[in-house]
Amino acid sequence: MAFILRKLPVDAFLEQRKTTPVADVRSPGEYAEGHIPGAVNIPLFDDEQRAEVGTVYKKEGNINAVLRGIDLAAPGMSDKLRKALDLASGGKLLVHCWRGGMRSEAMAWLFSQGGIDSSLLGGGYKAYRNHILSDLDRERKFIILGGLTGSGKTGILRHMKSAGVQVTDLEGLASHRGSAFGALGQAPQPTSEHFANLLYDDLASMRDDEPIWLEDESRNIGTVFMPDCFSLRMQTAPVIALMMSIETRLPRLLEEYTTFPAEEIMASVMKISKRLGGDRTREAADALRKGDYPTAIRITLEYYDKAYHYGLSKRAEGQVTYINTETDDVAVNAALVMEAARNLG
């Protein structure tokens, strides 16, 4: 087949992604740092080869870098083409590199030798990142569900989502439940870069004329940092804060965390030891060693409750709507939250 070099703008590329597989031809290290969700890595160069070509470019110029790149890539061309043939759908592929330049163009030519019709991402992954960060800074109708640790916010949002409410699960995307204990039982966290890619995809499926609910989070969720632009949007959105007593929250926290080994709980407590103070940290550690989880949880909640109340006090006047509840029933509390949302100005 004749080789035709076709480059698409980001919007068109992402629209075609719904039906056409994406081959990311950057190095494995670049891909691991962040990639278009669903893209498959078929690298032109591995990480060491990419570094070598970059060094040749700096020292000897473009032509010698191209020649060295051909030397390095040529032995693996058949394997790259086989992977592309396995990935292609209906003889078509979407292909991108970092800037939409030589790497994606070279791989598109290679794939054409196997009869694959490739469309390239104009501007590459760099253009995609600029696009999504601009979109994440776009004004949306966010409503933040806040509440004290253990008040069941995640369960409430899931209940609301099952009823057709638009919800973005930030903790799910970040693989972390948002406290010193948040990594327990979770998959490895994505990079902050890839989290933003996942977040963009999630929000892209939602309607602009309906509110989007988010759980109240600080700028970082574990090791993941939200984009500054998105975090600032969250900080100015209305907050509905669910307030309940420690005794009401305690059964849920016991159910969630006592399934983990005591040493893992202990390690999580030590992460906040400076904030708890030496005496309270020792008391929590002693309680854990004795299997007295309720006491350990109460001690940690003293810190988290104080910190959360302080955070709410920093919000703008009238930004926070408080709901007091005496039950941990998810359906009941979801109804209370939705009623409060209807009364927002």
Model regions: which residues?
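Flexible, polar/low-complexity N-terminal or interdomain linker segments that lie immediately upstream
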Residues: 1-37, 65, 133-137, 142-148
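Positively charged, proline/Ser/Thr-rich regional signature most characteristic
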Residues: 16-88
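Hydrophobic/aromatic beta-strand patches that form the interior of the parallel beta-sheet core
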Residues: 23, 40-42, 94, 119, ...
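Catalytic cysteine-centered active loop of the rhodanese-like fold, especially the PTP/DSP P-loop
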Residues: 67-122
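Long, charge-dense
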Residues: 117-133, 254, 265-268, 272
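Glycine-rich phosphate-binding P-loop
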Residues: 143-162
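Conserved nucleotide-sensing/catalytic segment adjacent to the nucleotide-binding pocket
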Residues: 163-232
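Conserved NTP phosphate-binding and transfer environment spanning the P-loop NTPase/kinase superfamily
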Residues: 234-239, 243-345
